């Protein structure tokens, strides 16, 4: 994964710089998300790793994407095809989203709880994270009964494990040492 990120980073950064310059960050995010989905398609996978000439591969990829990709996006696809990098489009899209969130002072937080959270609880978590991170927070909530009770919050590098399962695990480690 780290290798894919290293390969994808210059493409994502270049795309982000162009998007900011042309005030089209959301448009680029949509284009890259769509292109990433196309590159992950099981029909497209063999073509990306095959021996098809880069110009033909780029033309095929662009025709599959149709009007979902503008001229600047098509140029990115052509450059990536020339360098044999179309298979890293999902990583480019992911990095672009990270750059976008950083630029917009936003962060996505994954919240896993033992039971469904009420809208009031979600708002409390969101407000607390916004204060702590000094960013606008978008919550992605899910449930996992294995937590027993409590929540686990992941926002960027920050991980807060307030679950009973986590507390039991830490207690067990202390007792064994």
From Swiss-Prot:
Question: Where can this protein be found?
Answer: Cell inner membrane
Q: Which domain of life is it from?
A: Bacteria
Cite the InterPro entries for this sequence: ATP_synth_OSCP/delta_N_sf (IPR026015), ATPase_OSCP/d_CS (IPR020781), ATPase_OSCP/dsu (IPR000711)
As for membrane topology, the entry says:
Peripheral membrane protein
- GO cellular component terms? plasma membrane; proton-transporting ATP synthase complex
Do the record's keywords include Cell inner membrane? yes
One GO molecular function term of this record is: proton-transporting ATP synthase activity, rotational mechanism
Question: Which Cys residues form disulphide pairs?
Answer: none
Swiss-Prot/TrEMBL keywords: ATP synthesis, Cell inner membrane, Cell membrane, CF(1), Hydrogen ion transport, Ion transport, Membrane, Transport
What this chain does, per the record?
Answer: F(1)F(0) ATP synthase produces ATP from ADP in the presence of a proton or sodium gradient. F-type ATPases consist of two structural domains, F(1) containing the extramembraneous catalytic core and F(0) containing the membrane proton channel, linked together by a central stalk and a peripheral stalk. During catalysis, ATP synthesis in the catalytic domain of F(1) is coupled via a rotary mechanism of the central stalk subunits to proton translocation. This protein is part of the stalk that links CF(0) to CF(1). It either transmits conformational changes from CF(0) to CF(1) or is implicated in proton conduction.
| Family to which the UniProt record says this protein belongs | Belongs to the ATPase delta chain family.
PANTHER family from the UniProt entry:
ATP SYNTHASE DELTA CHAIN
Q: Quaternary structure?
A: F-type ATPases have 2 components, F(1) - the catalytic core - and F(0) - the membrane proton channel. F(1) has five subunits: alpha(3), beta(3), gamma(1), delta(1), epsilon(1). F(0) has three main subunits: a(1), b(2) and c(10-14). The alpha and beta chains form an alternating ring which encloses part of the gamma chain. F(1) is attached to F(0) by a central stalk formed by the gamma and epsilon chains, while a peripheral stalk is formed by the delta and b chains.
Protein name according to UniProt: ATP synthase subunit delta
């Amino acid at each position: 994964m780290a290798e894919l990120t290293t390969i994808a980073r210059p493409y994502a950064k270049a795309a982000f710089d162009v998007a900011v310059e042309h005030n089209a960050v959301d448009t680029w995010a949509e284009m890259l998300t769509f292109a990433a989905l196309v590159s992950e398609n099981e029909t497209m996978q063999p073509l990306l790793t095959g021996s098809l000439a880069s110009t033909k591969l780029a033309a095929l990829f662009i025709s599959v994407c149709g009007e979902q990709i503008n001229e600047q996006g098509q140029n990115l696809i052509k450059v990536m095809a020339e360098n044999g990098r179309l298979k890293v489009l999902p990583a480019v899209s992911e990095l672009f989203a990270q750059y976008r969130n950083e630029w917009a002072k936003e962060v996505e937080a994954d919240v896993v709880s033992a039971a469904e959270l009420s809208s009031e609880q979600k708002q409390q978590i969101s407000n607390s994270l916004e204060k702590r991170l000094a960013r606008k927070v978008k919550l992605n909530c899910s449930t996992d009964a294995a937590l027993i009770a409590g929540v686990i919050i992941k926002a960027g590098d920050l991980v807060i494990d307030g679950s009973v399962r986590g507390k039991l695990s830490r207690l067990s480690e202390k007792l064994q040492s």
